[in-house]
A protein has these predicted regions:
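Intrinsically disordered, low-complexity segments enriched in serine/threonine/proline/glycine
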Residues: 10, 47-48
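Compositionally biased, intrinsically disordered low-complexity segments enriched
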Residues: 25-26, 47, 99, 124, ...
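Basic/polar, cationic surfaces and motifs that engage anionic cell-wall
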Residues: 2, 20-37, 43, 49, ...
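C-terminal motif of bacterial Sec signal peptides marking the signal peptidase cleavage site
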Residues: 15-18
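Sec-dependent N-terminal signal peptides
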Residues: 2-11
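Active-site-adjacent loop/helix surface patches within enzyme catalytic domains
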Residues: 67-86, 93-218
Length: 255
Protein backbone atom coordinates (compact mmCIF):
# COMPACT_ATOMS: atom_id res chain seq x y z
CA UNK A 1 0.00 0.00 0.00
CA UNK A 2 1.10 3.44 -0.81
CA UNK A 3 0.71 5.59 2.31
CA UNK A 4 1.73 9.14 1.63
CA UNK A 5 3.48 11.05 4.37
CA UNK A 6 2.64 13.49 7.11
CA UNK A 7 2.60 16.45 4.72
CA UNK A 8 0.41 14.54 2.23
CA UNK A 9 -2.10 12.74 4.42
CA UNK A 10 -4.91 13.18 1.93
CA UNK A 11 -2.87 11.48 -0.79
CA UNK A 12 -1.98 8.72 1.65
CA UNK A 13 -5.67 8.01 2.20
CA UNK A 14 -6.29 7.65 -1.57
CA UNK A 15 -4.39 4.35 -1.54
CA UNK A 16 -6.38 3.06 1.41
CA UNK A 17 -10.10 2.71 2.04
CA UNK A 18 -10.86 4.11 5.48
CA UNK A 19 -13.74 4.33 7.89
CA UNK A 20 -14.35 4.16 11.58
CA UNK A 21 -16.83 2.76 14.04
CA UNK A 22 -15.53 3.78 17.46
CA UNK A 23 -15.85 0.96 19.92
CA UNK A 24 -14.00 2.69 22.71
CA UNK A 25 -12.67 6.11 23.56
CA UNK A 26 -9.39 6.88 21.80
CA UNK A 27 -6.39 6.06 23.92
CA UNK A 28 -3.76 8.58 22.89
CA UNK A 29 -1.37 7.41 25.56
CA UNK A 30 1.19 4.88 24.57
CA UNK A 31 1.56 1.65 26.45
CA UNK A 32 4.92 -0.02 26.19
CA UNK A 33 4.50 -3.79 26.16
CA UNK A 34 7.30 -5.36 28.16
CA UNK A 35 5.82 -8.65 29.26
CA UNK A 36 3.06 -11.05 28.33
CA UNK A 37 0.82 -9.94 31.17
CA UNK A 38 0.59 -6.33 29.98
CA UNK A 39 -0.57 -6.92 26.42
CA UNK A 40 -4.23 -7.08 25.46
CA UNK A 41 -3.26 -9.08 22.37
CA UNK A 42 -1.62 -12.07 24.02
CA UNK A 43 -3.18 -14.63 21.75
CA UNK A 44 -6.47 -15.96 20.49
CA UNK A 45 -5.57 -19.49 21.46
CA UNK A 46 -4.87 -20.88 24.91
CA UNK A 47 -1.26 -20.93 26.03
CA UNK A 48 -1.86 -24.21 27.83
CA UNK A 49 -1.65 -27.63 26.21
CA UNK A 50 -4.74 -29.65 25.41
CA UNK A 51 -6.10 -31.95 28.09
CA UNK A 52 -4.25 -35.22 28.13
CA UNK A 53 -0.79 -33.71 27.65
CA UNK A 54 1.29 -32.34 24.80
CA UNK A 55 4.37 -33.56 23.02
CA UNK A 56 7.82 -32.26 23.91
CA UNK A 57 7.87 -30.38 20.59
CA UNK A 58 4.61 -28.66 21.44
CA UNK A 59 5.88 -27.83 24.92
CA UNK A 60 8.95 -26.16 23.40
CA UNK A 61 6.89 -24.08 20.96
CA UNK A 62 6.74 -20.44 22.16
CA UNK A 63 3.33 -19.05 22.98
CA UNK A 64 1.94 -15.90 21.41
CA UNK A 65 2.48 -14.02 24.66
CA UNK A 66 6.11 -15.12 24.82
CA UNK A 67 6.75 -14.12 21.21
CA UNK A 68 5.08 -10.75 21.70
CA UNK A 69 7.16 -10.09 24.80
CA UNK A 70 10.32 -10.39 22.66
CA UNK A 71 9.14 -7.57 20.37
CA UNK A 72 9.43 -3.86 21.07
CA UNK A 73 5.72 -3.07 20.65
CA UNK A 74 4.01 0.12 21.74
CA UNK A 75 0.22 0.15 21.73
CA UNK A 76 -1.33 3.40 20.50
CA UNK A 77 -4.95 2.53 19.76
CA UNK A 78 -7.16 5.14 18.09
CA UNK A 79 -10.90 4.55 17.88
CA UNK A 80 -11.05 6.10 14.38
CA UNK A 81 -9.01 3.15 13.11
CA UNK A 82 -11.29 0.40 14.48
CA UNK A 83 -13.94 -0.66 11.98
CA UNK A 84 -15.65 -3.50 13.77
CA UNK A 85 -14.86 -6.92 15.15
CA UNK A 86 -12.95 -9.13 12.75
CA UNK A 87 -13.07 -12.33 14.76
CA UNK A 88 -10.09 -14.67 14.99
CA UNK A 89 -11.74 -17.34 12.84
CA UNK A 90 -11.78 -14.98 9.84
CA UNK A 91 -8.05 -14.29 9.81
CA UNK A 92 -6.51 -15.47 6.51
CA UNK A 93 -3.88 -12.99 5.31
CA UNK A 94 -0.97 -10.83 6.37
CA UNK A 95 -0.69 -7.87 3.98
CA UNK A 96 2.68 -6.11 3.80
CA UNK A 97 2.84 -2.42 2.89
CA UNK A 98 5.45 0.33 2.55
CA UNK A 99 4.68 3.64 4.22
CA UNK A 100 6.27 5.60 1.34
CA UNK A 101 7.31 8.22 3.86
CA UNK A 102 10.48 8.22 5.94
CA UNK A 103 8.90 9.17 9.27
CA UNK A 104 8.57 7.47 12.61
CA UNK A 105 5.66 5.12 13.18
CA UNK A 106 4.35 7.41 15.91
CA UNK A 107 4.27 10.34 13.49
CA UNK A 108 2.55 8.26 10.85
CA UNK A 109 -0.19 7.24 13.30
CA UNK A 110 -0.78 10.90 14.12
CA UNK A 111 -0.87 11.73 10.41
CA UNK A 112 -3.44 9.04 9.74
CA UNK A 113 -5.67 10.33 12.50
CA UNK A 114 -5.34 14.01 11.58
CA UNK A 115 -6.23 13.26 7.95
CA UNK A 116 -9.73 12.26 9.04
CA UNK A 117 -9.79 9.44 6.50
CA UNK A 118 -9.86 6.73 9.17
CA UNK A 119 -7.23 4.54 7.51
CA UNK A 120 -4.58 2.49 9.28
CA UNK A 121 -2.85 -0.85 9.52
CA UNK A 122 -2.67 -2.86 12.69
CA UNK A 123 1.13 -2.52 12.88
CA UNK A 124 3.89 -0.16 11.71
CA UNK A 125 7.52 -1.36 11.86
CA UNK A 126 10.20 1.31 12.27
CA UNK A 127 13.67 1.02 10.76
CA UNK A 128 15.14 0.39 14.21
CA UNK A 129 12.84 -2.61 14.71
CA UNK A 130 10.45 -0.95 17.13
CA UNK A 131 6.76 -1.44 16.38
CA UNK A 132 3.62 0.60 16.95
CA UNK A 133 0.28 -1.20 17.11
CA UNK A 134 -2.70 1.10 16.56
CA UNK A 135 -5.51 -1.43 15.98
CA UNK A 136 -6.22 -4.56 18.07
CA UNK A 137 -5.54 -7.92 16.43
CA UNK A 138 -9.19 -8.96 16.19
CA UNK A 139 -10.48 -5.60 14.96
CA UNK A 140 -10.84 -4.61 11.31
CA UNK A 141 -8.45 -1.95 10.02
CA UNK A 142 -8.74 -0.22 6.65
CA UNK A 143 -5.34 -0.89 5.12
CA UNK A 144 -5.98 -2.90 1.95
CA UNK A 145 -8.70 -0.82 0.33
CA UNK A 146 -10.26 -1.85 -2.95
CA UNK A 147 -8.72 -4.71 -4.90
CA UNK A 148 -8.90 -5.83 -8.51
CA UNK A 149 -12.26 -7.04 -9.78
CA UNK A 150 -12.55 -10.75 -9.06
CA UNK A 151 -10.11 -10.74 -6.17
CA UNK A 152 -12.77 -11.33 -3.51
CA UNK A 153 -13.45 -14.69 -5.13
CA UNK A 154 -9.80 -15.42 -5.90
CA UNK A 155 -8.70 -14.75 -2.32
CA UNK A 156 -11.75 -16.29 -0.67
CA UNK A 157 -12.91 -13.08 1.04
CA UNK A 158 -16.19 -11.17 0.92
CA UNK A 159 -18.07 -8.09 2.04
CA UNK A 160 -20.19 -9.80 4.67
CA UNK A 161 -21.17 -6.88 6.89
CA UNK A 162 -18.47 -7.12 9.57
CA UNK A 163 -16.68 -4.07 8.15
CA UNK A 164 -18.64 -0.93 9.01
CA UNK A 165 -17.14 0.75 5.89
CA UNK A 166 -17.59 4.20 7.38
CA UNK A 167 -15.48 6.69 5.49
CA UNK A 168 -14.99 4.34 2.56
CA UNK A 169 -15.13 6.00 -0.85
CA UNK A 170 -16.64 4.48 -3.97
CA UNK A 171 -14.70 1.99 -6.05
CA UNK A 172 -12.17 3.97 -8.10
CA UNK A 173 -12.83 2.20 -11.41
CA UNK A 174 -14.61 -0.72 -13.05
CA UNK A 175 -11.44 -2.78 -12.78
CA UNK A 176 -10.91 -2.07 -9.06
CA UNK A 177 -14.13 -3.04 -7.31
CA UNK A 178 -13.58 -5.75 -4.69
CA UNK A 179 -13.47 -4.80 -1.04
CA UNK A 180 -13.21 -7.88 1.17
CA UNK A 181 -9.58 -8.05 2.26
CA UNK A 182 -9.71 -5.77 5.31
CA UNK A 183 -12.07 -8.13 7.13
CA UNK A 184 -9.77 -11.13 6.68
CA UNK A 185 -6.31 -9.73 7.28
CA UNK A 186 -3.67 -8.07 9.40
CA UNK A 187 -1.87 -5.12 7.82
CA UNK A 188 1.82 -4.46 8.48
CA UNK A 189 3.27 -1.14 7.38
CA UNK A 190 7.04 -1.06 6.85
CA UNK A 191 8.69 2.35 7.16
CA UNK A 192 10.33 2.62 3.75
CA UNK A 193 10.34 4.83 0.67
CA UNK A 194 10.77 3.04 -2.65
CA UNK A 195 14.14 3.65 -4.23
CA UNK A 196 15.68 5.15 -1.11
CA UNK A 197 17.92 2.41 0.17
CA UNK A 198 17.79 -1.01 1.73
CA UNK A 199 15.57 -2.32 4.49
CA UNK A 200 17.70 -2.46 7.66
CA UNK A 201 18.36 -5.88 9.12
CA UNK A 202 16.88 -4.80 12.45
CA UNK A 203 13.64 -3.91 10.69
CA UNK A 204 13.51 -7.20 8.80
CA UNK A 205 14.17 -9.18 11.97
CA UNK A 206 11.30 -7.34 13.66
CA UNK A 207 9.01 -8.28 10.76
CA UNK A 208 10.13 -11.91 11.17
CA UNK A 209 9.23 -11.80 14.84
CA UNK A 210 5.93 -10.04 14.20
CA UNK A 211 4.85 -12.66 11.66
CA UNK A 212 5.78 -15.43 14.11
CA UNK A 213 3.69 -13.71 16.79
CA UNK A 214 0.69 -13.35 14.47
CA UNK A 215 0.96 -17.03 13.52
CA UNK A 216 1.04 -18.04 17.17
CA UNK A 217 -1.79 -15.68 18.11
CA UNK A 218 -4.14 -17.26 15.57
CA UNK A 219 -2.59 -20.73 15.87
CA UNK A 220 -2.32 -20.87 12.09
CA UNK A 221 -0.13 -19.52 9.31
CA UNK A 222 -1.84 -16.70 7.43
CA UNK A 223 -0.98 -16.37 3.75
CA UNK A 224 1.51 -13.53 3.23
CA UNK A 225 0.92 -11.09 0.36
CA UNK A 226 1.85 -7.51 -0.35
CA UNK A 227 -0.47 -4.65 -1.23
CA UNK A 228 0.10 -4.77 -4.97
CA UNK A 229 -0.94 -8.42 -5.05
CA UNK A 230 -4.40 -7.34 -3.85
CA UNK A 231 -4.55 -4.27 -6.10
CA UNK A 232 -2.29 -4.39 -9.13
CA UNK A 233 -2.05 -0.61 -9.48
CA UNK A 234 -0.23 -0.26 -6.16
CA UNK A 235 3.54 -0.13 -5.94
CA UNK A 236 4.11 -1.51 -2.46
CA UNK A 237 6.02 -3.39 -1.45
CA UNK A 238 8.96 -1.94 -3.36
CA UNK A 239 11.29 -3.67 -5.80
CA UNK A 240 13.93 -3.65 -3.06
CA UNK A 241 11.67 -5.95 -1.04
CA UNK A 242 11.06 -8.54 -3.78
CA UNK A 243 13.49 -11.18 -2.51
CA UNK A 244 12.31 -10.74 1.06
CA UNK A 245 8.68 -11.06 -0.02
CA UNK A 246 9.44 -14.31 -1.83
CA UNK A 247 11.18 -15.63 1.28
CA UNK A 248 8.32 -14.60 3.56
CA UNK A 249 5.81 -16.32 1.31
CA UNK A 250 7.95 -19.45 1.13
CA UNK A 251 9.23 -19.89 4.69
CA UNK A 252 8.01 -16.86 6.71
CA UNK A 253 11.36 -15.17 7.39
CA UNK A 254 13.27 -12.63 5.31
CA UNK A 255 16.38 -14.79 4.77
Amino acid sequence: MRLIGILAAAALACTLAGCAAPQQQPDHSQLKVNDAGVSSDGGAQSDEGAEGGVSSAEEAKPTASELRAKLDITEDYRSDFNHGEKGASYQKYIVLHDTEVDSSAASIVNSWESSGNKVASQFIVNKDGSIVQCVPMDAIAHHAGYGDAGHNSEYGVSEDGRDDKRGTTKAPSKSITDYGMNSYSIGIEIVHVSGQGAYPETQLEAIDGLIAYIDAYYDSESTIIDHKMWRSGNSDTSAEFATYLANYRDHRTHN
